[in-house]
Amino acid sequence: RGAGFTICDVQPVVEVTGRVIQTRAVPAGAGVGYGWAVTAAEGMRLATIGVGYADGWPRQLSAVGGAAFEGRLLPFVGRISMDSLVVDVSALPPDALKPGDHVELLGPNRTPEQLALDGATIDYEVIARLGRRLCREYVS
């Protein structure tokens, strides 16, 4: 964090979560993402999340970084698609993440600064790119 954050008690004001659309097991050799950008070296459990680059999620984060769930980082797998992205949930217990659950894409565990480093950009761009398709909830 920049110097301004160390002298003020500034709290994060933005959190982005993505809803799990589906989970599935994929065997070794299966392709994942647009053009099968990734081939599973071994069997994996994957979750498709309903956020993509049309929502302002940076494509530069394809295969770097990840989402957070219950304190664990779930690595992105393959390319960020227009309407979805995929995370590896193999490290979670089999029924820990189900369709309808939410993962943290931006928030206390995945800060704008971290996303900017992963995506070779700046934290202001991460926030500015967030699109109108994302549901907004204002809290006091």
Locations of regions flagged by a protein language model:
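Active-site anion/phosphate-binding pocket segments in diverse small-molecule metabolic enzymes
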Residues: 1-140
